[in-house]
C-alpha cells in the first residue's frame, strides 16, 4: 500500500492535482479516488492539497470540468458522477481526520456540487451523464446515489437538513431498480457491481445479483474482466469488486 501511495504522491502536481499518470490528464473522480488513497496511507497533507485543488477549480455553477490537462480545462462538459463524488471524498477525509474546521470549509463546495448534479435529474428520477439528456448510466447513477447518501451524512454533521436530497436519492434509486430501459446497456463489470457498491441494491437482492454475474465477469485466480466479452482483467474493477464484497459482508 505504501508503494502505491508513494506513486500517487509522486504523480501529484505542485498545485495539488493528481493526474492519471505523471504528465497526463486529470479527471475529478479519479483525482478524488487518489486523494482517498493518500489518506488511507497516512499522507494527509498530500490529500488536503488534492482537496484544495478542487476548491480552487470548482466552477460558479458548482461543477468541475470532465477533464483537465497541464493545469487547464481539456474537456469542459460536466460529468455528473465526477462532480457528485466530492461528497464521498469529503466524508472520507472528515471520518479519517475529524477536522471540523476543514469540513466547514469544504461544506459549501459539496453543497454547490450536489446542487449542480441535481439540476440534471429528470422527471423519471434518473440523472443524465453529461450534456445529452438521453444518456444515463447505471454505474454513474449508482455512484451518484452513493454520493447523495454521503452528502446527507455531511449535512447531518453540519446540523443541516436537506430533504430535497433525500427525495432525489429515493427517486434515483427507484429509477435504477424499476426502469432499466432508461439506462444505456453496456457490457462492463461496473454495471454489475456498482448498484451494490452504491447501496442501490441491498440485502438478498445484492447477493443474488453478485451470484448472477460472477461467472460472467470473474476470471478465477486473476480478478475481474472489465467487459464480459474480452479477456482483460483490470486492477480497478477487481479492487472495486473487493470493496463491493466487503460492503455486502
Predicted feature locations:
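Extended glycan-interaction surfaces of carbohydrate-active proteins
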Residues: 1-25, 48-83, 107, 112-133, ...
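N-terminal beta1-alpha1-beta2 module of alpha/beta enzyme domains
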Residues: 11, 20, 24-32, 36, ...
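Residues that mark the junctions of alpha-helical repeat units in TPR/alpha-solenoid scaffolds
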Residues: 27, 31, 79, 83-86, ...
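Well-ordered alpha-helical scaffold segments within catalytic/enzyme domains
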Residues: 32-46, 85-102, 143-160, 193-204, ...
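Loop-centered beta-sheet repeat module
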Residues: 134-179
Amino acid at each position: 500500500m505504501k508503494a502505491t501511495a508513494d506513486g500517487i504522491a509522486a504523480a501529484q502536481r505542485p498545485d495539488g492535482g493528481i493526474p492519471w499518470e505523471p504528465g497526463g490528464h486529470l479527471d475529478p473522480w479519479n483525482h478524488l479516488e487518489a486523494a482517498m488513497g493518500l489518506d488511507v496511507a497516512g499522507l494527509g497533507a498530500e490529500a488536503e492539497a488534492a482537496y484544495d485543488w478542487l476548491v480552487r477549480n470548482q466552477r460558479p455553477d458548482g461543477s468541475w470540468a470532465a477533464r483537465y490537462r497541464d493545469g487547464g480545462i481539456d474537456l469542459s462538459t460536466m460529468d455528473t458522477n465526477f462532480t457528485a463524488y466530492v461528497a464521498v471524498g469529503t466524508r472520507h477525509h472528515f471520518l479519517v481526520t475529524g477536522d471540523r474546521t476543514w469540513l466547514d470549509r469544504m461544506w459549501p463546495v459539496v453543497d454547490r456540487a450536489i446542487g449542480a448534479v441535481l439540476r440534471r435529474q429528470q422527471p423519471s428520477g434518473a440523472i443524465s451523464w453529461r450534456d445529452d439528456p438521453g444518456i444515463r448510466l447505471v454505474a454513474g447513477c449508482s455512484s451518484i446515489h452513493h454520493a447523495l447518501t454521503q452528502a446527507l451524512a455531511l449535512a447531518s454533521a453540519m446540523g443541516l437538513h436537506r430533504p430535497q436530497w433525500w427525495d432525489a436519492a429515493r427517486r434515483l434509486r427507484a429509477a435504477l431498480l424499476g426502469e432499466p430501459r432508461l439506462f444505456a446497456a453496456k457490457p462492463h463489470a461496473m454495471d454489475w457491481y456498482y448498484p451494490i457498491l452504491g447501496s442501490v441494491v441491498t440485502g438478498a437482492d445484492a447477493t443474488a445479483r453478485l451470484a448472477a454475474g460472477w461467472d460472467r465477469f470473474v476470471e478465477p485466480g486473476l480478478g475481474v474482466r472489465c467487459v464480459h466479452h474480452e479477456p482483460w482483467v483490470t486492477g480497478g474493477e477487481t479492487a472495486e469488486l473487493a470493496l463491493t464484497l466487503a460492503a455486502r459482508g
